[in-house]
């Protein structure tokens, strides 16, 4: 069987481990797929333009900025699978005297950019907890790296920020006040994003890639040591781990949120669409499900493929 070369570009470094498991676990080869993996970190609009022009085939990500072009201009973007439905930047770094979300009223909260996915997540999270921007809390753009924002909190320049689990370790190491808060449903992580134009011309490759994705998720969730070996070998530089502990907590955090069956949850779609609608309020009435075509995953699921993988793990 001839290998297919699919041009895949990830939008965040945290996506790389699952793609590397697909590759180094042998699942791309197993299903007759070849992937050219590249980065479009911090290049949300460039990735969109390249996908639109057919200069790349699949984006891993671009979670909220495709609703507007689809809703307002009828562009053929589509999401085919979703690996994570949980917001994971749920570690609050706060000044002394702040012990939870309720204490952020009247305070100054910093994130990297409140038009980015990370910043918009915090806007929505605070809103869901009764804190409206402007009325109850001030949202300010801050440093890109969570640890740098944590330092600014400790210096009194901000009252609080939110970080992910690895940055939580680093913030605690420098003496920051770090509090775990509840999460919320959210479309994050590896999302298989493409266009209906590409899918219609490459259905076989799409099916094979999704089979490789399902296999990689199963491997990731059930073979901890082997997955950590792949992370250590192939992802340390891109993820910039500074210790084995950081690598381990990253892995455990990923495993806890990876979906065995890569469907989005309704609440996660609702929440990510709220981010898109904040940026483009004229599309409030648009149905976000228009962008989701899950029938390829459903085919794999209905065939019993995923259930057999996990049944074999339990009996093996």
Range-by-range predicted roles:
Residues 20, 67-68, 123, 169-172, ...:
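Predominant activation on well-ordered alpha-helical scaffold segments within soluble catalytic domains
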Residues 36, 44, 138-140, 245-254, ...:
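Short linear loop/turn motifs
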Residues 2-141, 159-165, 179-186:
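Short, glycine-/small- and polar/acidic-enriched structural segments
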Residues 148-239:
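Pocket-lining segment of extracytoplasmic ligand-binding domains
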Residues 97-100, 127, 196, 200, ...:
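Proline/Glycine/Serine-rich low-complexity intrinsically disordered segments
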Residues 202-285:
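Secondary-structure end/capping motifs
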Residues 46-48, 146-152, 167-168, 250, ...:
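Short, hydrophobic alpha-helical packing/hinge segments within bilobed ligand-binding/sensory domains
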Residues 273, 277-316:
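Conserved C-terminal helix/tail region of periplasmic/extracytoplasmic solute-binding proteins
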